[in-house]
A protein has these predicted regions:
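A cross-family signal for key residues in well-ordered alpha-helices
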Residues: 10-11, 44, 82, 100
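Acidic, PIN/NYN-like endoribonuclease modules and their adjacent C-terminal/linker elements
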Residues: 1, 99-132
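Non-catalytic, well-ordered alpha-helical scaffold segments
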Residues: 7, 40-43, 61, 96-99
Length: 132
């Protein structure tokens, strides 16, 4: 079981060529967990990639279908609010939500955003994979 950050899912599905290291990590992780926020963040990233012509809209539709096939256990963010607030000086509320969930579940957070790993006071393992 792991908590998967949006950056890792994007690299596993949307970055071309696909980030094989992240793809293999997610495939072998067992349960993938994330706050409900992941769905909106994922769509936001796809939108940006299409708008900046980094990704064709037809490809984005195929990636959305691949994303829909992922089995991700989604968690409400409200029980995480206190820890998210505690992290406010060093992390965005979005990043802190993923961190807080990993801490609550006692599992690693898998990311492709190395700045998150340098946040002080984290209470969980952070697995950083190079961005694709």
């Amino acid at each position: 079981m792991i908590v998967v950050d949006t950056s890792a899912v994007v690299d596993a599905l949307a970055v071309r060529p696909v980030n094989r290291l992240v793809h293999e990590r997610l495939a072998g992780a067992g349960d993938l967990c994330a706050p409900h926020l992941i769905d909106t963040e994922f769509l936001s990233v796809l939108r940006r990639l299409v708008r900046t012509c980094s990704l064709h809209s037809v490809t984005a539709d195929a990636i959305r279908n691949d994303y829909a096939q992922l089995t991700i256990l989604r968690f409400d963010h409200l029980p995480l609010s206190e820890r998210v607030w505690e992290l406010r000086h060093n992390a965005s509320a979005f990043d802190a939500t993923f961190i807080a969930l990993a801490e609550l579940l006692g599992v690693p957070l898998v990311i492709c955003d190395e700045r998150i790993a340098s946040i002080p006071g984290l209470r969980t393992a952070i697995e950083v994979y190079p961005a694709g």
